[in-house]
Amino acid sequence: MKKKNQTWKYFVYAFLVTIAVTFIFHKQIGYWITDLTIKYSNKNTGQGLNPEYDVGEVQPYSTAAAAEAAFRAKDVRARGQISIPSVGMSLPVYQGLNDVHLYLGAAEHSRREHANPEKNGNYILASHYINHRGSLFEPLVRVKSGEKIYVAFNDKVYEYEIDGLYQISVRDDSWLQDEKEKKIITLYTCVSLYTPDLRWVVRGHRVKEYELNESLPQHIVNSFAIDSTLKGTYLAAYEYLRPQ
C-alpha cells in the first residue's frame, strides 16, 4: 500500500510540474497580450464553478488546499484580470468567493448586481496571502498611495488610484459595505498565516476608464503581461505532494 501511495504521489507531482510550466512561465492567464491590444481568451472550455459568497465557508490557507486548487484549475474560467504594475502583480479575476478561486487569482466577494467595475459601488476582491514574494495578494503589502490598479472587464479597462494600505481587524466589516454612490475598489487578504485576526486592505477610487482595443496605452497592456503571480500556489502544491 505504501509503495502504491508513493507511485501515486510521483504521478501527481509530475502532473503538477507540467501545469506549473503552463501557469507560471507563460504570460497568458486567460488573456492574449500583444504589442497593441489585450483580448479575452475563450480557450478555457471548463464549465466553471458555482459562485459562492459566504466568507465563513472559506478555509485557512494550507498546502493541501493549494494542491487541490492546482488540480481544479481546468474547471474555472476568469471573467477579468487585475494588475498593479508598481508591485508586479497580475492575476485573473473569478466570479465568487471559494477556495479554488482564492488560490488561483482574485475572487469577487459580493453577489450584488452592481458588484463589478462597470457599476457604481464597492468592487471587492479577495485572495490568499502566501509567504512567497510576488504570489497572489502578497504584493499588496508593498503598495503606496497614488499608485494605480487596472481591472480589465468585458470590453473596458478601469483605472483606480490607491488611497492607502490598512491593517484591520477581521471583525471590522465596514470596508466590505456597499458604497452605491462611489466608484471604489477594495482588495483584502490575510496579514500572515500566524495572525488570523488581522487583514490587509487596499482601498482605491476609480479615476478613468479605457476601451479595450488598440488604443489602450502601452503601459497598461504591459501591466497585464507581467509574469503570473501564481507561483506560490504551485510551489505549495509541490511541497505537499513531493515524494519523500
Regions of interest found by a model, annotated:
Residues 2-244:
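Solvent-exposed, non-transmembrane regions of membrane-associated and secreted proteins
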